Amino acid sequence: SAASDVYKRQKLMVSQNAPFVPMYDAWQAGSRKMLAYEDDKARRDAEIIDAKVLSNRRPPYGITGGLYDALKATGGEFFVATNAMARKARKLFKELEGVDIYSASGVALASLVNAVAAGKIEKDAVVMLNITGGGEEHFKEDKELWYLKPSHVFPLEPDTDDVVAKVEALFAKNIAE
């Protein structure tokens, strides 16, 4: 049927913000398992990228039904965009659509632009691009903003009991206030 033909043609194309690209590296290596990523380097790389939401150290990549399986099932591809590419794409979107977008959307748009330029997208392809964060700059124009610091920062490998105790203490504190 026509509906099943459309479904068969769907291809998942995802991106990461360089230099924080652990899923991209695993995908390029053909690995379901995330590759080793030294903690200090991972932290440093995550600090460099604009799209902080793309800096998950333990994403649902290799789990059954996770991103690896979804990419495999759709013949998908993984792309990388630098901060400069993403900023350029965000600027282009604002010029063409009149609204600002989040950094992660800029990474996705930059990857799409690069994929089109490289001939990886057919000219008659139907493309769905997930764009988030439209209008934040406009929203902030006449608002007073407060930048809050976290109440607690856990180590990379926290003790489960410590996490539970700290979270319970946060809720107890908020309830008492």
Predicted segments with their positions:
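Active-site catalytic pocket residues across diverse enzymes, especially alpha/beta-hydrolases
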Residues: 4, 27, 115-119
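Short glycine/serine/threonine-rich phosphate/pyrophosphate-binding segments
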Residues: 1, 23, 104-112
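Active-site/ligand-binding loops adjacent to catalytic centers
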Residues: 5-9, 13-100, 144-177
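Catalytic phosphate/nucleotide-handling subdomain of diverse soluble enzymes
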Residues: 107-174
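Extended hydrophobic-aromatic, low-complexity segments
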Residues: 79-80, 99-103, 123-124, 139-140
